[in-house]
């Protein structure tokens, strides 16, 4: 296929298929793996220089919509009905989204009868497309590494902004989830990377028991250290303790643990292998 692909490794646990509409993401998340992917544009640059370039702007991939139309048409002809996640290596709702490509992509999914799975840190920027996301039968997902800004005080917001400087605030993401729920769109959360296990557990408690917009599905991961700082954080966390505490919270709220990767079912949660096997 031309732009839709089958993820490998850890990403395959999230969805059977994925599509990255853009290159680059100005959310500037320190844990972003996008800059580590192969890209001829980074030739001659240090990793730090390339990270700055990657996080400076969002660029549409050449002919992304035409390629998506072609792939969806081919999948329809093969009766391949697997859902497609948007996006792993970029964000479908960056602050500088060019030409509203994501909305056009969702229209293509609806036209061809495929279910899109959104994963974003753009918060309420995504709400403008909820009409078409619902029509396409899609899911709305967001990444969470921290608790809502107002619950742990100003320090929480400062901590989040240090890691995700230009992403939507956690309260904005919470508001987006509530609006999606009001539209009748299934809502899910990707709870990783875990920077502070207490915040992650507090988030699970709040979001799994929320009376207005209880989440439909959770995918739980950990933190995989990639530099001195994140390796130190990873080493400092008791992952089996975190995993079992998270399971207890979700089971107590009525969620069933599922073990098939890439599945989205209402009332369930999935623990990624890396966290499941952590010792």
Regions found by a protein language model. Name each.
Residues 2, 19, 28-30, 47, ...:
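Generic intrinsically disordered, low-complexity segments enriched for polar/acidic and small residues
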Residues 225, 230-279:
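C-terminal accessory extensions appended to soluble enzyme cores
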Residues 63-249:
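Conserved AdoMet/S-adenosylmethionine-binding subsite of the radical SAM
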Residues 1-83:
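N-terminal [4Fe-4S]-dependent radical SAM core
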Residues 43, 102-104, 207, 273-277:
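Generic alpha-helical propensity signal that fires on short helical segments
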